[in-house]
A protein has these predicted regions:
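Non-catalytic signal-transmission and effector/linker regions of two-component phosphorelay proteins
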Residues: 1-9, 15-30, 55, 88-91, ...
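Alpha4 helix (beta4-alpha4-beta5 surface) of REC/receiver domains from two-component response regulators
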Residues: 3, 76, 89-95, 100-118
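Conserved sequence signature across two-component system core domains
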Residues: 11-12, 21, 37, 63
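C-terminal compact regulatory domains
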Residues: 18, 39, 98-101
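Helix N-cap/capping motif at the beta->alpha junctions
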Residues: 36-49, 74
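Conserved phosphotransfer cores of two-component systems
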Residues: 52, 56-58, 82-90, 112
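Active-site residues of response regulator receiver
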Residues: 66
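Receiver (REC) domain active-site loop signature in two-component systems and cognate sites
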Residues: 69
């Protein structure tokens, strides 16, 4: 891939899922930096919390968030994100990455403009579709033997 994203964030309380997703993103060299959070509230605070803009790192290009997590759920994370000013939201592509294919969950996520919905596991093909759609990027996928 010629161009990388600068920063991808994974928000998932499942350590194995986070490890595998991090490994996939690293193997494909999709981003210069990948950050992982097990708690949605910590991720939101770190990314968009109450601090002056000079002390905050640049917004990530892409955030994958699980829906079902203890504490602040993925839905609550989306609510917090949706309350951010529009120019702030436009800096980051938000993608739900979940095992849920329940109609109520997909309908609820569909209420948020510009939020992508992907089912686990994250694969090269799903990532390629997302990158093509939202970033006009193409992975150099090589067949595995």
């Amino acid at each position: 891939m010629a161009a990388n994203l600068n920063h991808i964030v994974l928000v998932d309380d499942n350590e194995t899922t986070s490890f595998l997703n991090n490994r996939l993103l690293g193997r494909l060299a999709v981003a210069n930096q990948v950050s992982t959070f097990a708690r949605a509230d910590e991720a939101f605070e770190q990314l968009w919390g109450e601090q002056d803009s000079n002390g905050r790192p640049p917004a990530p290009d892409l955030v994958f968030v699980d829906l079902k997590m203890p504490g602040v759920s993925g839905f609550e994370f989306l609510e917090l994100y949706n309350a951010l000013p529009q120019p702030v939201q436009e800096q980051t592509v938000m993608a739900v990455l979940t095992t849920s294919m329940h109609g109520a969950d997909t309908a609820r996520v569909a209420q948020y403009p510009n939020v992508e919905y992907l089912t686990k596991p994250l694969t090269e093909e799903k990532l390629q579709r997302l990158l093509s759609k939202r970033f006009d990027l193409k992975l150099n996928l090589t067949p595995t033997k």
